[in-house]
Structures are given as structure tokens and as C-alpha cells.
Regions:
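Nucleotidyltransferase catalytic core that binds NTPs
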Residues: 1-161, 169, 173, 205
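Phosphate/ribose-recognition catalytic cores of enzymes acting on nucleotide-derived substrates
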Residues: 150-209
Length: 209
């Protein structure tokens, strides 16, 4: 928290809201949120209940702070879709602003999880985005399935990396597409296990927009 506050101060923030657990959850939160299909695919399928927890804490935050705008990074592509669905469901007058993924010089998407990587793991982690970029170029002259399989194979060929899932989806609905002609807005969302622990890293790339 201290490190985050220092960064926020450099950015000119006037206030930081850092509530205790008791402030956020004065009573047990029994609300259940589900917005198929965006909460049931990809992360929703591999981590059941994850987005319900996200919606619980984000909705509490919105109710307490009452913001006009909320900013979310595109690295977690699915989370943005879930939060937008939550805002529509709750009828909040709130603009969700999508922020470009910020990357290290070697292409690794910035994330708090990166601090958990060992030196060896940190050295191979950028190969995830390298494979995604190569896949985008490859996809210009190959089928969607061929592109999908190449990205997965390229990452799995790296010792210490293992793809949990790689989904090529409609950028709005998050439903998997079978052909490049299925949508005008196509994104690839990936989760990769890195290292022996392992650390779970997510990333994405836009194929068509």
C-alpha cells in the first residue's frame, strides 16, 4: 500500500481510499452476480466464483465512492466486460474507461504478480507476448485454428511456461469464434503458468478491431 500511495502521489492524486475489511464488508455479502456468457467463459470457467467475488467488491466500492469514471486496464480483458455488465445491471451512471495495457520494455504486461517471479521466470515471461504478436502476424495468412494452435505450441515449447487456456473470441461478447470472418472485433485472451510455483499470468492481443 505504501508503494502504491507513493506512485499515486507522483501522479498528483489528492486522496486514497484504502478501507479495512470491516469497512468494505460490515456484514457477510450474500449477493450473487452472474452475467452469462461473460462470467462463465475463460476465467469464469477455470476459476468458478471468481467473478462473483469481483462483482461483490467492485459494486461495494462503487456504492461507497460514487465515482463518475472508473479506470480498468485492458490486460484483464474479461474483467472489463464483467464490470460493464455489472454497471448496466446496477443501473449506475458511471463511465468505465478502458486503459491500454502498460508493458515493460521487453513486452511483459505490467502486473503486481510480476514481483513474485524469480529471475529465471522473469526472463521467460516476455515470451508470452512475443508468441501473441507472432500469432497475430501469422493469422494474417492462416486460419484461426492454425493461429490458435501455433500460439499455444510456441509458448508450451518454452521450458517453464504452460498455457492454461488461449481463447480467440468476439471482443464484445467474449464468445469463441471459429473463423476470422465471424466478427469484426476479435481478441485473443490467454492465461499461462510460469515457473515451478507456478505464477499465473494473463495477457491479450487484438486480432481485429
Amino acid at each position: 500500500l505504501d508503494a502504491d500511495c507513493a506512485l499515486l502521489e507522483q501522479c498528483g492524486a489528492d486522496y486514497v481510499f484504502a478501507p479495512s475489511v470491516e469497512e468494505m464488508y460490515p456484514t457477510k455479502d450474500n449477493r450473487h452476480f452472474e452475467f452469462p456468457p461473460v462470467t462463465t467463459v475463460m476465467e469464469g470457467a477455470h476459476r468458478p466464483g471468481h467473478f462473483n467475488g469481483v462483482c461483490q467488491v467492485v459494486s461495494r466500492l462503487f456504492y461507497i465512492v460514487r465515482p463518475d469514471r472508473a479506470y480498468f486496464g485492458e490486460k484483464d480483458w474479461q474483467q472489463i466486460a464483467v464490470v460493464k455488465a455489472l454497471v448496466r445491471y446496477l443501473g449506475l451512471k458511471l463511465q468505465i474507461v478502458e486503459c491500454d495495457t502498460i508493458r515493460e520494455a521487453d513486452g511483459l504486461a505490467k502486473s503486481s504478480r510480476n514481483t513474485l517471479l524469480s529471475a529465471d521466470e522473469r526472463a521467460i515471461a516476455p515470451k508470452i507476448y512475443s508468441a501473441l504478436k507472432a500469432g497475430k502476424e501469422y493469422g494474417a495468412t492462416h486460419t484461426l485454428k492454425e493461429t490458435h494452435d501455433k500460439v499455444v505450441a510456441d509458448i508450451n515449447a518454452v521450458d517453464g511456461l504452460e498455457v492454461e487456456y488461449f481463447s480467440i473470441v468476439d471482443g464484445n461478447t467474449l464468445q469463441e469464434v471459429q473463423s476470422w470472418d465471424d466478427s469484426q472485433y476479435i481478441a485473443g485472451c490467454i492465461t499461462v503458468y510460469c515457473g515451478k510455483t507456478p505464477i499465473r499470468l494473463i495477457d491479450h492481443i487484438t486480432f481485429k478491431e
